[in-house]
Amino acid sequence: MANTRPENPSLGLVIPCYNEEAALPHLLVSLEAVQKKANIPIRVLLVDDGSQDRTYEIIAAAIHPGSNLACIRFSRNFGHQIAVFAGLHHVVGDVIGVIDADLQDPPEVLLKMVNKWREGFDVVYGVRRNRKENLLLRSGYSLFYRMLQGIANIEIPLDSGDFCVMDRRVVELIKQMPEHTPLIRGLRSWVGFRQTGLEYERAARVDGESKYSLPRLVNLAVQGLVSFSALPLRLAAWLGFFTSIVGFALMIWAIVSAVGFGKTPPGWASLAVIVLFFSGVQLIVLGIIGEYLGRVFEEVKNRPHFIVESSLGWVAPADQSRS
């Protein structure tokens, strides 16, 4: 392969955590079991995304001199995708894995992904065969992935989240992306290189509650739409064109009715319907444009992506923010 793999690679893991005090003890046990099975060194970076429970205290108690664990703690909650993005900026290793703390994605699958990476793939992402969430969330996720794949200007694999391993050069390229609202799975696809999927059974949460509610999923979907497609803007233009044709047709109908047949078009009721229809179309178009303008506004402010309040373990205390 063009990209030569090191003989003794190291694996770095990025694990975003937000109010995961219930799941963390199980996660730490699973990570220890994976470390015993692995024939490569593993370093784990836990990113505390401004948790309000005992997440940070549990992590701090698990870190000791010589530990392969480290942690960075945000000054507030910046969001799951930003937590992964920050982890990519601080993690070390020849190959980098991303996994959530809830153990829905089995850590032992990471070792199979690393084997695929050894074969020459630069990105190995997990493909979920099934999900154990409730019907509403399963339907929402399914719709999100299919809609994103259908309108994005790049190929984003179906049913693949952030669970993956990436070659170091892929991570370095993602770190250069300036987006303040990054969608990691989208950026991972955008960089290209050799990518492949690995199917696995997605489990139920080991403990605690899911942090991705339906409103958060909708926000993630909007983020994906405006980040990787201009189709909504094109649809708005076509909608405007269609409504203009409808308006022109109504005008012709009114003229023909009055001049040719001596019939006066219906009064205030039809006028109210027409006004409401066109007003609704205008508001929809303004909303779409506003969503894109809002993203541009966030980018031009150029605020830091995140702020690190403190760090523990092997992670360097430098680079406390990313602008």
Regions found by a protein language model. Give the residues of each.
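Short conserved micro-motifs on helix faces and helix-strand junctions that flank
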Residues: P16, F74-R76, C164, A237, ...
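Hydrophobic helical membrane-anchoring modules
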Residues: A2-S10, L183-S323
